[in-house]
Amino acid sequence: MIRRPPRSTPLYSSAASDVYKRQVVFNPKKSWGVDMLMLGYCSIIAIIILLMIGMAQFGALVKFWPYNLSLTLKHYHFEVAGLGWESFYNSVEMAFYTAVFGTVVIFVGAYVVEKIKSDEKLRGIVQFFALMPMAVPGVVLGLAYIFYIISKENPLNFIYATMAILVINTIVHFYTVSHLTGVTALKQMDKEFEAVSLSLKVPIYKMFFRVTLPVCLPTVFDIFIYLFCNAMTTVSGVIFLYSYDTTLASVSSIHLDEQGDVAGAAAMAMLIVYISFLVRGIHTIISTFLLKRTQAWRNI
C-alpha cells in the first residue's frame, strides 16, 4: 500500500521548488522589540477602524441621535420606499454576478497577456486596456456608459437600466487591480510548463485547467472576494446607471442620509459590512479547506 508522504518530506519541497523556481522563501529573524512596535502600530490602526464601524453600528441602533439614545431595530425597517431591503438584495445579486463573471474574465485575460506569446502586439493592446480603468474615475465610467448605450439605435441599448450594465461597469471599474494580481501569480510559475506542453502537443486548455488554474487557485479566490466586497461598496461607478428596480445599498445609504434619515443610512451601511464580513468568512473557510486538500506542496 502506497502512502502519501508527509508534507515535511523533500517530495513536497521539490514540487514547490519546481513550480516556483525563482521564488525564495523569506524567513525574517525574530526581534521582540520590532515585533511589539509593529503590533502596537497595527493595533492602533485596527482600533480606529473598529471605532468607526462601532459608531456607525451604534447610530443605527439608537432611536434619535443624540437626544434619545435608547436602542431600537426600527431603523432596519427602512420606511422609505425603494431604499430598503430591495436595494440590499440588489447589491448582493450584483456583487455575486460581478465576482463570478469578473473572476473568469479577468483571470483568463491575465493568462492571455502573460502566457500566450504568439502575438506580441495583441498582448500589448490587451495589457494597455487592462491598465486603463485604474486611471479612469468611476463617475467618468458611468457617464460614458450612459452616453454610449442610451441611444435607441445602439444594439446594446437593451441592457440600459438593467442589472447587466451594473455588473459590466463594476467589472471594468475594478479590473486593473485584479488583472495585476492574476498576472503576478502567473509570472511566478515556471515558463517551462508552457514549453513542455507545446513540445508534447498538449492543448492549451488542458494545460490551463490541469496545471495553471489549480496552482493559481489562491489568487482566483482573492480576485473573487476583492470584486465582491468592492461591488458591495461602490458608489461612483453606478450612481448614474441604476434604475428604480436596480437601486443598490450603497446608493440607498447616500439617499437616506440626504433625506435626513441618518440612522437609516447607518443601518444600510452596516448591512453592507455584515454581508462583506459573512462572505469573507465563508471565503476563508472554503479556501483554507480546498488549499489544504489540493495544494499540500505549498507546505500550508
Give names to the regions the model predicted.
Residues 1-16, 20:
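Single conserved hydrophobic/aromatic residue that forms the stacking wall/gate
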Residues 3-4, 34-64, 80-187, 204-206, ...:
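Membrane-water interface segments at the C-terminal ends of transmembrane alpha-helices
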Residues 14-43, 121-123, 284-300:
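Transmembrane alpha-helical segments of polytopic membrane transport and secretion proteins
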Residues 197:
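The alpha-helix within a helix-turn-helix
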